[in-house]
Amino acid sequence: MFVATALALGAAVLHTAWNLRVKQSGDRWLALWGLFAAGGIIGLPYAVVATVSGDLGWSAWGWATASGAVHAFYIGRLARTYEVADFSVTYPIARGGGAMFAAIGGVLFLSDRLSTLSMIGILIVVSGLTLLAGHVDWNHVGPALVVGLLIGTYTVIDSKGSRSTVGSAYAMAIFVTGGVGTTIQGLARRRWSEMRASVPVMWKQYASTGLASLVTYWMVLLAVRRAPVGYVTALRESSVVLASFIGWRILKEGSGVRRIVASTTMVVGLVTLVVGR
């Protein structure tokens, strides 16, 4: 259990860290593009081997491609939201809202069933979101909710895709298609010259954040093999509380105590949602 605890908490810290790095970047979209491009390059050999061995079929690649397209929109919206909204607002709402939207999407599109306890969990999450949004400009809350909706959308797609493959190969495919999708988005936005020019200067950040994102996934995967999913989720989603604390103490954002209480409420709701499934 100690190993699972360390892995889950480590994943929470890593996920918060790379999001904070993006928030503090001068060009948030470029930072996110570099993250996914680097993650795709790192994950490509694994995905190729899994495809050749048959562990990663064409059906899974189809779902991964759809997920990559949604990720491209997600990256664009997340970058824009980090430009206009506080870190301690965007991150908790996006993460909490994403899990809530994913649960609802699972019922609508994957024939999942929610128990009474899970529905109570959703209500608790909504309460936390309401508390967090209560004294925040809607121009900040709205974009964060859109990010959460996109997270919920690609989570539902990935849930379907992961059921059609073996092991963690699908996660590598997501990074590959996400990197391709984001690159195509950059080309469509006529940012190729900026993307190319940023690589010699920013490649260390791109590689470190891309690797951190991949390692985050692996740590959660290893943790759930050693401990109950609900326990791991509780520790993993503690990242929303950590983000609120960082926003308050490091980034000097306002309403720190209120945002920490709201984020903690969302964690309780998310854990209740998972345990009730």
Language-model regions, residue ranges each:
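C-terminal appended segment following the main domain
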Residues: M219-R277
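Specific alpha-helical transmembrane segments that line the substrate/conduction pathway
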Residues: A66-H71, R80-V126, A171-G179, V229-R249
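Functionally critical, cavity-lining and gating residues within the transmembrane helices
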Residues: Y74-I75, A102, Y154-T155, S213-Y217, ...
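Membrane-interface interhelical linkers
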Residues: M1-A69, F73-F87, G134-L145, V176-R226, ...
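Selected transmembrane alpha-helices and immediately adjacent juxtamembrane segments
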Residues: N139-M172
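Short hydrophobic alpha-helical membrane-embedded segments
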Residues: G10, W33-I41, I93-F101, M119-I120, ...
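Hydrophobic transmembrane alpha-helices of multi-pass small-molecule transport proteins
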Residues: A37-G43, M100-V107, L114-A133, R258-R277
